[in-house]
A protein has these predicted regions:
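Acidic catalytic/metal-coordinating carboxylates
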Residues: 33-36, 61-64
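Conserved acidic carboxylate
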Residues: 8
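Active-site beta3 strand of CheY-like receiver
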Residues: 46-52
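C-terminal output helix
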Residues: 86, 106-111
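Charged docking surfaces used in two-component/phosphorelay signaling
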Residues: 15-23
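Receiver (REC) domain active-site loop signature in two-component systems and cognate sites
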Residues: 55-57
Length: 111
């Protein structure tokens, strides 16, 4: 079973993502900020297949978290979640190590 780390500060979006991923058969760990994601990732010895990261969060944002996770592992898939839809935002995410970018709002099938 694939293990996914979800980091999203908005409760409704995080719940939507988690519910849909669990329904699809994934093992999901969710947190609401970058600092908690680092803590969980470290405590779990990086035992995740994919990380879904919101970009705009208080404290450690998704860009910094993406860079940190990528320094820990080149194996984990990183997907950025954001309401930003400009091409440059997508390019920036890919340049810092993300594998994909999903624009909010999104449907369960996009996950």
């Amino acid at each position: 079973m694939k293990r996914i780390l979800v980091c999203e500060d908005e409760d409704a979006i995080r719940d939507f993502v988690v519910i849909n991923l669990v329904r699809s058969g994934y093992d999901v760990v969710d947190v609401s900020c970058g600092e908690d994601a680092v803590k969980v990732y470290t405590e779990q010895n990086g035992n995740f297949d994919v990380a879904l990261l919101d970009i705009m969060m208080p404290g450690m944002d998704g860009f910094a978290l993406c860079r940190w996770i990528r320094e820990q592992s080149s194996e984990i898939g990183i997907i950025m979640l954001s309401a930003k839809s400009q091409e440059m935002d997508k390019v920036n995410c890919l340049m810092i190590g993300a594998d994909d970018y999903v624009t909010k709002p999104f449907s369960p099938s996009e996950l």
